[in-house]
Amino acid sequence: MKTLYSLRRFSHVETLFNTTLTVAGRDQETTGFAWWAGNARLINLSGKLLGAHVAHAGLIVFWAGAMNLFEVAHFGPEKPMYEQGLILLPHLATLGWGVGPGGEIIDTFPYFVSGVLHLISSAVLGFGGIYHALLGPEIIEESFPLFRYVWKDRNKMTTILGIHLILLGIGAFLLVFKALYFGGVYDTWAPGGGDVRKITNLTLSPSIIFGFLLKSPFGGDGWIVSVDDLEDIIGGHVWVGSICIFGGIWHILTKPFAWARRALVWSGEAYLSYSLGALSLFGFTACCFVWFNNTAYPSEFYGPTGPEASQAQAFTFLVRDQRLGANVGAAQGPTGLGKYLMRSPTGEVIFGGETMRFWDLRAPWLEPLRGPNGLDLNRLKKDIQPWQERRSAEYMTHAPLGSLNSVGGVATEINAVNYVSPRSWLATSHFCLGFFFFVGHLWHAGRARAAAAGFEKGIDRDFEPVLSMTPLN
């Protein structure tokens, strides 16, 4: 009877129902992997593996360019971005392109240019992927010794890690240069309702930047998600970029320490598991960031955060009832607490009613009305500006609630039908991606550790039920 798994590999292999199937001249017998195992068949064919990765990058960039142009074609300047189902243009607007005071979109040409540039670069990547997959050398180091690598070569792997870190550091500095020198970025906190500005006074104090990492993730502390001014965000990118670049140089110049050589598994599947674990952490962090943070993700483009929409509702009705003669400082609600205003656990004046749970919200349209002890009653009576009323009424009716199938918004709000917040989409998608990547991390880590320990050789095929079944035709 044939051996249906490769004795050369210590890795679990699924059985093909039809063992005669051969794809691209590589069948399960010769490679140890079934046709659907994709890049696993290319583990030792560095040229073809390069082609697969370059082609994959081309697909990603093609999607970005095509989706970008699709959003430009459908964009209407008379409605806010978050009402139009856009997920890419808000990112470009946040970078300061095409935006005027108050977050108004005044020019869509930069968005068109972005889409075209991505399409052109995707064509270059696509050509490179096809070339390396079909025409280039199967094993690239036979032609270019510089690119020789073996998965178990710890020194070469850390050199590759170093190169990746340097590229990530350069990416972080691209945002820094955009904010400092190339037109600035959109600041939702700019006076009068937000504007594009250059960042001139970076926060570089390590106690502030790394203080975010040491904060509690709970309540008003909010870990790194609590960052609420662009000086801190851009300064943080200076730190991250510098650490990545210097760390990359260090990894290129050094060899792994003995403890690292012992503690880590050095195989292709292990590196895959480490990468998936890191991406999982990124996904969960991005989920929290886009859901709660209205500085890095301005509400003008992404819609209000949940707490922001709730506080906006309380503010809108306070404005209305105050105009009708209500004394908002004294009126009691059905609970005996203040109907419009009450005190937080720390004694600050906050909005009353159900929105009290969001008392530590900070938002650009609300902060001018605060004094040293929370909301200032005098300012609420005399200083509310029309733009604050308009914005809160808009945010009240566009809460990031509901399902992802275009019946979101506040259930009782007739104007919110067929509205789904990009915040809901981005937070949900990144949570799901973070979860699945974490499962993938556990799966591949378990396989890699088992292979390293030498006991993972797949299922005993002699008694596998499928062998007694009729082959699929």
UniProtKB/Swiss-Prot annotation:
Q: Which GO terms describe its molecular function?
A: chlorophyll binding; electron transporter, transferring electrons within the cyclic electron transport pathway of photosynthesis activity; metal ion binding
**Gene Ontology biological process:** photosynthetic electron transport in photosystem II
Kindly list the positions at which N-acetylthreonine occurs in this protein. 15
Chain ranges passing through the membrane = 69-93, 134-155, 178-200, 255-275, 291-312, 447-471
Q: Which residues carry this modification: Phosphothreonine?
A: 15
Task: Report the GO terms under cellular component.
Answer: photosystem II; plastid membrane; thylakoid membrane
Q: Which Gene3D superfamilies match?
A: photosystem ii from thermosynechococcus elongatus
Compartments, as annotated in UniProt: Plastid membrane
Q: Where does it primarily localize?
A: plastid
**Cofactor: binding details:** Binds multiple chlorophylls and provides some of the ligands for the Ca-4Mn-5O cluster of the oxygen-evolving complex. It may also provide a ligand for a Cl- that is required for oxygen evolution. PSII binds additional chlorophylls, carotenoids and specific lipids.
Propeptide residue range(s): 1-14
Please report a single Pfam family linked to this protein.
PSII
How does this protein sit in the membrane? Multi-pass membrane protein
Annotated [CaMn4O5] cluster binding sites: 367
InterPro entries, per this entry? PS_antenna-like (IPR000932), PS_II_antenna-like_sf (IPR036001), PSII_PsbC (IPR005869), PSII_PsbC_sf (IPR044900)
Q: What keywords would UniProt list here?
A: Acetylation, Chlorophyll, Chromophore, Manganese, Membrane, Metal-binding, Phosphoprotein, Photosynthesis, Photosystem II, Plastid, Transmembrane, Transmembrane helix
Described purpose of this protein according to its UniProt entry: One of the components of the core complex of photosystem II (PSII). It binds chlorophyll and helps catalyze the primary light-induced photochemical processes of PSII. PSII is a light-driven water:plastoquinone oxidoreductase, using light energy to abstract electrons from H(2)O, generating O(2) and a proton gradient subsequently used for ATP formation.
Describe, as the record does, how this protein assembles with itself and its partners.
PSII is composed of 1 copy each of membrane proteins PsbA, PsbB, PsbC, PsbD, PsbE, PsbF, PsbH, PsbI, PsbJ, PsbK, PsbL, PsbM, PsbT, PsbX, PsbY, PsbZ, Psb30/Ycf12, at least 3 peripheral proteins of the oxygen-evolving complex and a large number of cofactors. It forms dimeric complexes.
Tell me the protein family, please: Belongs to the PsbB/PsbC family. PsbC subfamily.
This chain belongs to which protein, by name?
Photosystem II CP43 reaction center protein
Q: Which species?
A: Cuscuta gronovii (Common dodder)
Q: Provide the taxonomic classification.
A: Eukaryota, Viridiplantae, Streptophyta, Embryophyta, Tracheophyta
